[in-house]
């Protein structure tokens, strides 16, 4: 962010966000190269396009020169595919400009975040809550006292033009919005992709993931902005602040009219939803709203959210995208774990003088387990096993060396062990390790044209244990290696604070 400020020399005159001229600046494409999601064409292998693997400033200079020479930045032809750029290498030019657009469109939001008074508090919280594992201790602390939960899938816009209209409240530069609209229609299949129930990130365009990640995050941010506003206002009914109310271009006028004419109704709505025990958390398009309230209150929340999305944001919210469940008999599918709050009966023996009593009590326990059936499906899609869970060889890796094959399988196994270390029951995790171990052995046997039994008999089974036991070796440095404790260790949940993204195999499920 400091680097961007140094380039742009931000001052008061830039508050109107004129972003279109930035497309003609070389440093924008350099930033796309430096901060890309490892998929930038500026440094990815481009054998099919005839360019080097490294970032080339000459390519950028030629692109900017061609943009200056054209009367219009984008030329549409009569062809059914309106992606013709400058009569040159249209694929390369289109992708380079889209990467520049991805950097530029983030500037108004990033700069406002840095200049906001809340930015320092956000920076402090991010240093301690950087890992997505940090949410599970929070859930364990909060969900034990709640009764019901709303499983919510964030709805999607019914048309791509709604995304552009929403961005108008943040970006006032009309030419840049027209260019953004073009790229949305260039990836016209995005509307059909976001309707899938599968994880969104896997379906983003491989050409420019950063561009679509930003659009999707902004879409989700807008969809829950008013909900967050109402949640805050439920504790401050006398407050009339509108800074947190993110709406369209003329939202100040709307809010003023709203507060004057409908103040009593607004406070009545807030009173209906006032719940000091409500908790809300989200990851990507999946959000959870839990409460200690009655089922009637949860139905009100569901009715309100559906009407809010459909009437205010024009989002298509299907009935099956919000489910009301009771925590005591329902698993929460979140971040690749199945979490639940189960009542656990226990007996307490109390001694009083010469008499003893046995008291039966029920304690709520927060459990997190590995969803074994979806994980087997993910392993089957990745060609490590069939859909019944039987390990198979990986023919695509058979051409690699033995050490590379073992290293690949070992890395996947260690990453899964690392990510699912918080599981309450390790049996499912051991089954996944077994599938990967035998798949590795079958791949090596296929390479050497031998059977698994004869191959393991010749080399010994110890060579596969090395990459499977590395996770335990790391734990031995962190925690004391006591025999009693080490046996208990694998039954306990361990949360790591260095995990910044969900596991790839979990995304496939």
Swiss-Prot record:
User: What S-S linkages are listed for this chain?
Assistant: none
Q: Which of UniProt's keywords are assigned here? A: Chloroplast, mRNA processing, Plastid, RNA-binding, tRNA processing
Q: Where are the transmembrane segments?
A: none
Q: Name one GO biological process term.
A: tRNA processing
Q: Name one GO molecular function term.
A: RNA binding
Which cell locations does it reside in? Plastid, Chloroplast
Question: A Gene Ontology CC term for this entry?
Answer: chloroplast
Keyword RNA-binding listed: yes
InterPro entries, from UniProt?
A: Domain_X, Maturase_MatK, Maturase_MatK_N
Classify the main location.
Answer: plastid
Please explain the role this protein plays, according to its UniProt record.
Usually encoded in the trnK tRNA gene intron. Probably assists in splicing its own and other chloroplast group II introns.
Per the record, the similarity remark reads: Belongs to the intron maturase 2 family. MatK subfamily.
What PANTHER family does the database record attribute to this sequence?
MATURASE K (PTHR34811:SF1)
Instruction: List the HAMAP family.
Output: MatK
Protein name in the entry: Maturase K
């Amino acid at each position: 962010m400091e680097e961007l400020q140094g380039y742009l020399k931000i001052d008061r005159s830039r508050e109107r966000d004129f972003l279109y001229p930035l497309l003609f600046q070389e440093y924008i494409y350099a930033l796309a190269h430096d901060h890309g999601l490892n998929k930038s064409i500026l440094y990815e292998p481009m054998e099919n396009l005839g360019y080097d693997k490294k970032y080339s400033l000459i390519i950028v200079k030629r692109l900017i020169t061609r943009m200056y020479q054209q009367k219009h930045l984008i030329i549409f032809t009569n062809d059914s595919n309106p992606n013709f750029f400058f009569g040159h290498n249209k694929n390369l030019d289109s992708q380079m400009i889209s990467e520049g657009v991805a950097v530029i469109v983030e500037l108004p939001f990033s700069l406002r975040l840095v200049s906001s008074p809340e930015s320092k508090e956000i920076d402090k919280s991010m240093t301690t809550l950087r890992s997505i594992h940090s949410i599970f201790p929070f859930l364990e602390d909060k969900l034990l006292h709640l009764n019901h939960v709303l499983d919510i899938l964030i709805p999607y816009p019914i048309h791509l033009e709604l995304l552009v209209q929403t961005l108008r409240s943040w970006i006032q530069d009309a030419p840049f919005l027209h260019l953004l609209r073009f790229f949305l229609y260039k990836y016209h299949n995005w509307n059909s992709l976001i309707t899938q129930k599968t994880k969104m990130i896997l379906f983003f365009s491989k050409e420019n993931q950063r561009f679509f990640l930003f659009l999707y995050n902004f879409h989700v941010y807008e969809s829950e902005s008013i909900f967050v506003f109402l949640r805050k206002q439920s504790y401050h009914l006398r407050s009339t602040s509108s800074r947190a109310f993110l709406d369209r271009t003329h939202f100040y006028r709307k809010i003023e009219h709203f507060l004057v004419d409908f103040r009593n109704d607004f406070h009545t709505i807030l009173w209906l939803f006032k719940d000091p025990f409500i908790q809300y958390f989200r990851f990507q398009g999946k959000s959870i709203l839990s409460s200690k309230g009655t089922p009637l209150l949860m139905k009100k929340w569901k009715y309100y959210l559906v009407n809010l999305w459909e009437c205010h944001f024009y989002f298509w919210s299907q009935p099956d995208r919000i489910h009301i469940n009771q925590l005591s008999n329902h698993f929460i599918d979140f971040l690749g774990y199945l979490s639940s709050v189960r009542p656990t009966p226990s007996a307490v023996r109390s001694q009083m003088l010469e008499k003893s009593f046995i008291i039966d009590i029920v304690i709520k326990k927060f459990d997190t387990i590995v969803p074994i059936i979806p994980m087997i499906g993910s392993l089957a899609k990745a060609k490590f096993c069939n859909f019944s869970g039987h390990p198979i060889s990986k023919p695509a890796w058979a051409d690699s060396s033995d050490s590379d094959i073992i290293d690949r399988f070992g890395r996947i196994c260690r990453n899964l062990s690392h990510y699912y270390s918080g599981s309450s029951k390790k049996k499912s995790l051991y089954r996944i390790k077994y599938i990967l171990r035998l798949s590795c052995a079958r791949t090596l046997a296929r390479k050497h044209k031998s059977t698994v039994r004869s191959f393991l008999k010749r080399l010994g089974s110890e060579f596969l244990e090395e990459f499977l036991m590395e996770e335990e070796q790391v734990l031995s440095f962190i925690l004391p290696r006591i025999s009693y404790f080490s046996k208990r260790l694998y039954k306990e949940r361990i949360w790591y604070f260095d995990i910044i993204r969900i596991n790839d195999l979990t995304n496939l499920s």
